[in-house]
C-alpha cells in the first residue's frame, strides 16, 4: 500500500536540522527525520518555510561577529 503525505523536503546541515526540530515543537508541524541532513516537514506549507527561514536568519545574525558591530 502506498501512502502519500503533503509536506516539504528539507536538506540542511546537522546543526540546522536540530534547530528545525526545536522550532517544530513551537510552530506545531511534524518533522520526519530521514537521515543526518534530510528532513520531511509534514503539513508544512509556505508559511512554515518562511517562519523557519526567518528564525534561522535571526540565529545566524546573533552568531555572526562583525568588526563593524564593535563600539568605538
UniProtKB/Swiss-Prot annotation:
Gene Ontology biological-process annotations: nucleotide-excision repair, preincision complex assembly; transcription by RNA polymerase II; transcription initiation at RNA polymerase II promoter
Gene3D superfamilies registered for this protein in UniProt: TFB5-like
GO cellular component: transcription factor TFIIH core complex; transcription factor TFIIH holo complex
Compartment list: Nucleus
The entry's keywords: DNA damage, DNA repair, Nucleus, Transcription, Transcription regulation
Name under which the protein is recorded: General transcription factor IIH subunit 5
Record's function text: Component of the general transcription and DNA repair factor IIH (TFIIH) core complex, which is involved in general and transcription-coupled nucleotide excision repair (NER) of damaged DNA and, when complexed to CAK, in RNA transcription by RNA polymerase II. In NER, TFIIH acts by opening DNA around the lesion to allow the excision of the damaged oligonucleotide and its replacement by a new DNA fragment. In transcription, TFIIH has an essential role in transcription initiation.
Highest taxon of source: Eukaryota
Chief location category: nucleus
Keyword Nucleotide-binding: no
Family stated for the protein in its record: Belongs to the TFB5 family.
Pfam families with a match to the protein in the record: Tfb5 (PF06331)
Assembly information from the UniProt record: Component of the 7-subunit TFIIH core complex composed of XPB/repB, XPD/repD, gtf2h1, gtf2h2, gtf2h3, gtf2h4 and gtf2h5, which is active in NER. The core complex associates with the 3-subunit CDK-activating kinase (CAK) module composed of cycH/cyclin H, cdk7 and mnat1 to form the 10-subunit holoenzyme (holo-TFIIH) active in transcription.
Amino acid at each position: 500500500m502506498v501512502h502519500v503525505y503533503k509536506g516539504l523536503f528539507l536538506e540542511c546541515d546537522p546543526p540546522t536540522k536540530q534547530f528545525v526540530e526545536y522550532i517544530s515543537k513551537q510552530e506545531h508541524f511534524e518533522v520526519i527525520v530521514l537521515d543526518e541532513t534530510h528532513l520531511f516537514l509534514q503539513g508544512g506549507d509556505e508559511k512554515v518555510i518562511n517562519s523557519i527561514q526567518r528564525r534561522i536568519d535571526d540565529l545566524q545574525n546573533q552568531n555572526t561577529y562583525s568588526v563593524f558591530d564593535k563600539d568605538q
